[in-house]
Design a protein with these regions (language model features):
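Membrane-interface loop-to-helix entry segments
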Residues: 117-159, 169-170, 207-214, 309-321, ...
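Membrane-water interface regions at transmembrane-helix termini and the short interhelical loops
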Residues: 29-33, 59, 102-110, 123-144, ...
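C-terminal membrane-solvent junction of multi-pass transporters and transport-like membrane proteins
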Residues: 170, 321-390
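Hydrophobic transmembrane alpha-helices that form the core helical bundles
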Residues: 80-113, 259-275
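Transmembrane alpha-helical segments of multi-pass small-molecule transport proteins
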Residues: 14-18, 84-89, 110-132, 145-156, ...
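Membrane-interface "cap" regions at the ends of multi-pass membrane proteins
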Residues: 1-38, 136, 174-179, 191, ...
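Extracellular loop-to-transmembrane helix junctions
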Residues: 29-59, 80, 214, 370, ...
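Juxtamembrane transmembrane-helix boundary signature
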Residues: 44-76, 83-89, 383-388
Length: 390
């Protein structure tokens, strides 16, 4: 019996849903002080860098038919894989809570029924998506994405309707910091993408489509957020929707975009949990993560996510850099045979520290790219030195 696989189109839909996100729109509002021209340039450069890494990460999982965190074991060993799986579950629980919080806050700003009510509604819809399952979402996802696409076109028409764009509004953010904030969003998906590309009929093509679709749509959301902040003078999503006169249409954008994006976070948290605890059922774990996210969203305020994004970058940028070096350049999978690959662990620590140090330096292309390049070079040189000694 043939195992059910996802098509290129289905993978594109999944990542369209990931890109249409309140988190992207909200992050885009931070770019307003740069002005439209510089802001768009920073968004595009950052997404090109981030989505190239996203593609390479997805190819590794697609070719090996392994989940994202299982592929990590090829470079870091069994215990190393468990370590990153644990960190990934933590960041995904965080993302789930943040997304539900943002969605509920924005929905409540449009239709005042209580934030906690919207937390429950959005959480219940995410659980429904999980129960249906990634390989059975085809028609439902097509309808949801079509509706979402139309609604975001309406939002774009309202935001850009007069054809005018604004100039710089201040110097609150450097260009390099803006690029890094643009890289950070696709980078946050690095530990997830293989969970979906491993299910694809044509993994490399599906990964390419996933990265391109996500990159284009995410850029679109960033630009909407940036120009909405300029257009309305607001950085609050609900106020932007209300001032734009979107009403119920805005509410639907908020709810559906939150569900389709957060589903990916919760689902991948479940898959990663299987790497930490082998007896856990991924689907049930994903439901538990959603419930925890709902509770967190109800109890805790989560208004600024920039530090959270940078923390994700500092953890996962050097991790994927080592994986890229091992899989594509060194062609090695030796770490599967060991409990912990100490050398790659040390190189990751160096990459992590380097990322945090580079955050204090204003680099036009952001700090992710130089951090990853240096980490890859260190990884290659270290392996070459070992071979020479042998």
């Amino acid at each position: 019996m043939n195992e059910k696989r996802t098509s290129i189109f289905e993978n594109g839909l999944i990542w369209f849903g990931a890109g249409v996100s309140l988190a992207e729109i909200l992050t885009g509002t931070y770019f307003a002080p740069l002005g439209f021209g510089k802001g768009v340039l920073a968004i595009i450069i950052g997404h090109i860098i981030g989505c190239m890494m996203l593609f390479l990460a997805g190819v590794i999982g697609g070719k090996t038919r392994q989940s994202a965190m299982e592929t990590v074991k090829m470079s870091f060993g069994e215990k190393g894989g468990v370590f990153f799986s644990f960190l990934n579950v933590l960041q995904l629980v965080g993302w789930t809570a943040i997304m539900i919080y943002d969605g509920a806050l924005a929905a409540n700003g449009v239709l005042h029924t209580g934030r906690w009510v919207w937390c429950l509604v959005i959480g219940a819809l995410i659980i429904l998506w999980i129960v249906i399952g990634i390989t059975n979402l085809g028609k439902i996802n097509t309808v949801a994405m079509a509706a979402l696409f139309i609604l975001t076109l309406v939002l774009s028409r309202v935001i850009f309707g007069d054809g005018s764009v604004a100039g710089a509004g201040g110097d609150a953010m450097t260009f390099g910091a803006a690029v890094e904030l643009s890289v950070a969003m696709p980078l946050s998906w690095l530990p997830l993408i293989s969970d979906y590309t491993r299910e694809a009929k044509e993994p490399v093509k599906a990964t390419a489509v996933s990265a391109v679709v996500y990159g284009v749509v995410s850029c679109w959301m960033y630009v909407i957020g940036m120009n909405a902040a300029i257009y309305t003078g607001e950085s609050d999503i609900a106020n932007i929707m209300v001032k734009a006169g979107l009403g119920i249409a805005g509410l639907l954008i908020i709810v559906f975009s939150t569900v389709t994006t957060t589903f990916l976070d919760a689902y991948s948290a479940g898959i990663s949990s299987e790497s930490v605890f082998s007896k856990i059922n991924g689907k049930y774990a994903a439901i538990v993560v959603t419930v925890i996210g709902m509770i967190g969203a109800i109890v805790y305020p989560m208004d600024n996510i920039t530090d959270f994004l940078y923390l994700i970058g500092s953890v996962f940028a050097p991790m994927i850099a080592i994986q890229i070096a091992d899989f594509f350049i060194l062609k090695r999978k030796d770490s599967l045979e060991v409990s912990l690959d100490v050398m790659n662990g040390v190189i990751w620590v160096i990459g992590f520290i380097l990322y945090r140090l580079l955050m204090n330096v204003d680099i036009p292309l952001g700090n992710t790219l130089p951090d990853m390049v240096i980490t890859i070079v260190i990884c290659i040189l270290a392996r070459k030195c070992i071979k020479t000694e042998k």
